[in-house]
């Protein structure tokens, strides 16, 4: 599949050629993570049926789970009303989406009020990240 496919032109890419992506678990509707895609990543995601993102730090395509085995099988791809955010409905293989070894990257919850509040960890580590990554 070409990253010049007509359907890719509908996406409003930012000035760096990227679009924000939210990965949501298809069964539970849990928000698992936030990442970025370029045209190539989105085209390869559609083609392969697994989530492939763009790593801004490494400046390369990143097949989610390539090291850990915690891949994301894509069930749906949606584009928001402004056409500038992509939602992936995924099946998270191995139940771990976060590099910290947790189910979701959104494991910190704000508790309290504006003056005395703080971020609390509300999800357990399911697997030690040192044993996940080589």
UniProtKB/Swiss-Prot annotation:
Binding sites annotated in the UniProt record for Zn(2+): 81, 98, 105
Entry's Gene Ontology molecular function annotations: magnesium ion binding; phosphoribosyl-AMP cyclohydrolase activity; zinc ion binding
GO BP field: L-histidine biosynthetic process
Recorded metabolic or biological pathway in which this protein acts: Amino-acid biosynthesis; L-histidine biosynthesis; L-histidine from 5-phospho-alpha-D-ribose 1-diphosphate: step 3/9
Keywords carried by this UniProt record: Amino-acid biosynthesis, Cytoplasm, Histidine biosynthesis, Hydrolase, Magnesium, Metal-binding, Zinc
Keyword check for Zinc: yes
GO cellular component terms given for this protein: cytoplasm
UniProt cofactor(s): Mg(2+); Zn(2+)
Localization per record: Cytoplasm
Catalytically driven reaction(s): 1-(5-phospho-beta-D-ribosyl)-5'-AMP + H2O = 1-(5-phospho-beta-D-ribosyl)-5-[(5-phospho-beta-D-ribosylamino)methylideneamino]imidazole-4-carboxamide
Cofactor remark: Binds 1 Mg(2+) ion per subunit. Binds 1 zinc ion per subunit.
Residues that, per the record, bind Mg(2+): 80, 82, 84
Short name of any one Pfam family annotated for the protein: PRA-CH
Predominant location: cytoplasm
First-level EC class: hydrolase
Source superkingdom: Bacteria
NCBIfam families in UniProt: PRK00051.1
Quaternary organization: Homodimer.
Family the UniProt entry places it in: Belongs to the PRA-CH family.
Function of the protein: Catalyzes the hydrolysis of the adenine ring of phosphoribosyl-AMP.
Listed name of the protein: Phosphoribosyl-AMP cyclohydrolase
Record organism: Herminiimonas arsenicoxydans
Lineage, top ranks: Bacteria, Pseudomonadati, Pseudomonadota, Betaproteobacteria, Burkholderiales
Gene, per the UniProt record: hisI
């Amino acid at each position: 599949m070409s990253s010049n496919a007509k359907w890719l032109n509908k996406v409003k890419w930012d000035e760096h050629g990227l679009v924000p992506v939210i990965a949501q678990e298809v069964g539970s509707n849990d928000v698992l993570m936030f990442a970025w895609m370029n045209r190539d990543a989105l085209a390869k995601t559609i083609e392969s049926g697994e989530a492939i993102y763009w790593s801004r730090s490494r400046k390369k395509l990143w097949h989610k789970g390539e090291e850990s085995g915690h891949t994301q099988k894509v069930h749906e791809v949606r584009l928001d009303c402004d056409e500038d955010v992509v939602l992936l409905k995924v099946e998270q293989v191995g139940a771990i989406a976060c590099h910290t070894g947790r189910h979701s990257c959104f494991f910190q919850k704000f508790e309290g009020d504006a003056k005395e509040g703080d971020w609390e960890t509300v999800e357990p580590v399911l697997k030690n990240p040192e044993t996940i990554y080589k």
